[in-house]
């Protein structure tokens, strides 16, 4: 799977651009503020309906316009597919896939699986369990068609349960929701656990390539003691939940634990090693997707030269090439990427003040 055409209209400082990317390595270079990262952001927006840089999606709309438009043609095994997205400053979003209106943004994510390696993505190991849970759920969503519905129901029931707790409801009033919570939690937890087990099998070899001297252990924690029955736990913790006004334990507290010996990885490894670990996680996740559903991710790699030294840039790019996936990578100077590849990039684009030029 790859993008074979990308149209960008009124996205940040890009007024209008049309790209015909290669299915291999696409190098996008230009000075800071030129708009090169905006191209990656536009691809991500098309696949996720939001930015990887700002939670306020209206900010990505060009200041002089009231809407942005993104359009892409995807090359898929079954033939080409067309995706279009329009976001208005009011917050309204219109999405079409092959001319048909799409109501759920999750359909975009399913159609266009994207992996991001940016300076911000290294927060995976530092910002607490939420980002690591999102990492697991990305894989669970793509690997099991039952996951999304169960995950939506967990969130719905948890919201209702927390509202009842804030209303000082009796346990009799909460019991019905607890039965629902347990049912959907079991589904979500089983899929998450199965996914992490599969990821681990791939991850060991990839971590060995990036960090041969470091023994990293990866494990899944479900959000409560695995030896405790979840239904009994909810009942026994009801007084505590009532006092705090929210559900203390459950799938919303799940985490991906990464340890070196007895220490968390972030305490045992240097910042450079942690960056390599995140790269290994992203590579493994993309490879597992290909194994499980025979679909490639699209990799967006931003500002690589500032994040990794020449040796590790070369290693990461080799791993990315080996996945067979389409890759978009940015740099200020093209030589920093070209010199790290065994062969020239399949396609190069220069960006200056929001204008994109193909370099032949």
Curated annotation (Swiss-Prot):
This is DNA replication and repair protein RecF. ATP binds at residues 30-37. Keywords: ATP-binding, Cytoplasm, DNA damage, DNA repair, DNA replication, DNA-binding, Nucleotide-binding, SOS response. GO terms for molecular function: ATP binding; single-stranded DNA binding. The RecF protein is involved in DNA metabolism; it is required for DNA replication and normal SOS inducibility. RecF binds preferentially to single-stranded, linear DNA. It also seems to bind ATP. It comes from the Bacteria. GO terms for cellular component: cytoplasm. It is found in: Cytoplasm. Belongs to the RecF family. HAMAP family: RecF. GO terms for biological process: DNA replication; DNA synthesis involved in DNA repair; double-strand break repair; SOS response. The gene is recF.
């Amino acid at each position: 799977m790859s993008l074979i055409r990308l149209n960008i209209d009124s996205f940040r400082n890009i007024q209008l651009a049309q790209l015909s990317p290669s299915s291999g390595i696409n190098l996008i270079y230009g000075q800071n503020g030129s708009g090169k990262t905006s191209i990656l952001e536009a691809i991500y927006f098309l696949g996720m309906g939001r930015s990887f840089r700002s939670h306020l999606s209206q900010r990505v709309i060009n200041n002089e316009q009231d809407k942005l438009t993104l359009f892409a043609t995807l090359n898929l095994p079954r033939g080409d597919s067309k995706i279009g997205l329009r976001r208005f400053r009011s917050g309204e979003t219109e999405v079409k896939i092959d001319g048909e209106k799409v109501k759920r943004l999750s359909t975009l994510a399913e159609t266009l699986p994207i992996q991001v390696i940016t300076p911000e993505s290294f927060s995976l190991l530092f910002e607490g369990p939420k980002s690591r849970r999102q990492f697991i759920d990305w894989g669970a969503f793509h690997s099991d068609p039952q996951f999304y519905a169960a995950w939506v129901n967990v969130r719905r029931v948890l919201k209702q349960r927390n509202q009842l707790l804030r209303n000082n409801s009796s346990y009799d009033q909460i019991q019905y929701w607890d039965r629902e919570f347990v049912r959907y939690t079991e589904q979500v937890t089983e899929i998450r656990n199965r996914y992490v087990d599969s990821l681990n099998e791939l991850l060991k070899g990839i971590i060995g390539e990036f960090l041969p001297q470091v023994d990293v252990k990866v494990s899944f924690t479900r959000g409560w003691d695995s030896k405790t029955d979840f239904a009994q736990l909810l009942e026994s913790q009801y007084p505590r939940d009532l006092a705090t006004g929210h559900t203390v334990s459950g799938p919303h507290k799940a985490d991906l634990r990464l340890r070196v010996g007895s220490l968390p990885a972030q305490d045992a490894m240097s910042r450079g090693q942690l960056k390599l670990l995140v790269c290994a996680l992203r590579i493994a996740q993309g490879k597992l997707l290909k194994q499980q559903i025979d679909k490639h991710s699209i990799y967006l790699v931003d500002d690589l030269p500032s994040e990794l030294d020449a040796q590790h840039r070369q290693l990461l790019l080799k791993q990315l090439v080996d996945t067979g996936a389409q890759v978009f990578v940015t740099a200020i100077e093209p030589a920093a990427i070209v010199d790290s590849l065994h062969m020239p990039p399949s396609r190069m684009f220069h960006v200056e003040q929001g204008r994109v030029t193909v370099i032949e």
